[in-house]
UniProtKB/Swiss-Prot annotation:
Annotated function: One of the primary rRNA binding proteins, it binds directly to 16S rRNA where it nucleates assembly of the body of the 30S subunit. With S5 and S12 plays an important role in translational accuracy.
Gene this protein is translated from: rps4
GO biological process, one term: translation
PROSITE patterns: RIBOSOMAL_S4, S4
Annotated signal peptide: none
Protein name per UniProt: Small ribosomal subunit protein uS4c
GO cellular component term, pick one: small ribosomal subunit
Sample GO molecular function, one term: structural constituent of ribosome
Domain S4 RNA-binding: 91-152
Domain of life: Eukaryota
Entry similarity comment: Belongs to the universal ribosomal protein uS4 family.
Organism: Pinus koraiensis (Korean pine)
Region (Disordered): 18-42
Quaternary organization: Part of the 30S ribosomal subunit. Contacts protein S5. The interaction surface between S4 and S5 is involved in control of translational fidelity.
Length: 203
């Protein structure tokens, strides 16, 4: 299954807030009507697990195959499979760029990476899924137009409080990864155990 490229508000109305997918919000009236309709129906356990999985996939902008691969890696790692899964996704380079406020969404961050604008430890990295690690330093290509774009994004989209695993130096346009993210700083409201259960027969 390919990465979703359709209307983002359609996904938001169905799955609620996904900050990585879009910063837009649906109109309250239509949104509340959809919520009322959905709450009046009995939802199966499979549907609940499916929707949690879809939240994760659309928020991080993954294909079905990519997400399944991350689940399989998480199962082989030490610790809670769900927590490891979220940590792996949060430490992707495109998500780090998004969480630093350098891009308004994860698709926007992915575009910066794909175009070769991002440096990790002074080396150009153009792979959005690149796994970042503690002590990595994230910078941008030294280009006035790019700096102006990043500054605008930071002014508009940098969160009031960065997650504690990240530090950002605005004058240098430099991000620093302090540690692996703690689960309480994950921006997406998700029940990761339901995602693991969904894939229990496939991973």
């Amino acid at each position: 299954m390919s990465r979703y490229r359709g209307p983002r508000l359609k996904i938001i109305r169905r799955l609620k807030t996904l900050p990585g997918l879009t910063s837009k919000r649906p109109k309250n009236r239509k949104d509340s009507m959809n919520m009322n309709r959905s709450s009046s129906r009995k939802i199966s356990q499979y549907r609940i697990r499916l929707e949690e999985k879809q939240k994760l996939r659309f928020h991080y902008g993954l294909t079905e195959r990519q997400l399944l691969k991350y689940v399989r890696v998480s199962r082989r790692a030490k610790g809670s499979t769900g927590q490891v899964l979220l940590q792996l996704l949060e430490m992707r380079l495109d998500n780090i760029i998004f969480r630093l406020g350098m891009a308004p969404t994860i698709p926007g961050a992915r575009q910066l990476v794909n175009h070769g604008h991002i440096r990790v430890n002074d080396h150009m990295v153009d792979i959005p899924s690149y796994p970042c690690k503690p002590q990595d330093v994230i910078t941008i290509r030294d280009q006035p137009r790019l700096r102006a774009i990043i500054k605008k994004n930071i002014d508009l989209f940098q969160r009031d409080k960065l997650p504690n695993h990240l530090t950002f130096h605005p004058l240098q346009y430099k991000g620093f990864i302090n540690q692996i993210i703690d689960s309480k700083w994950i921006s997406l409201k998700i029940n990761e155990l339901l995602v693991v259960e969904y894939y229990s027969r496939q991973a």
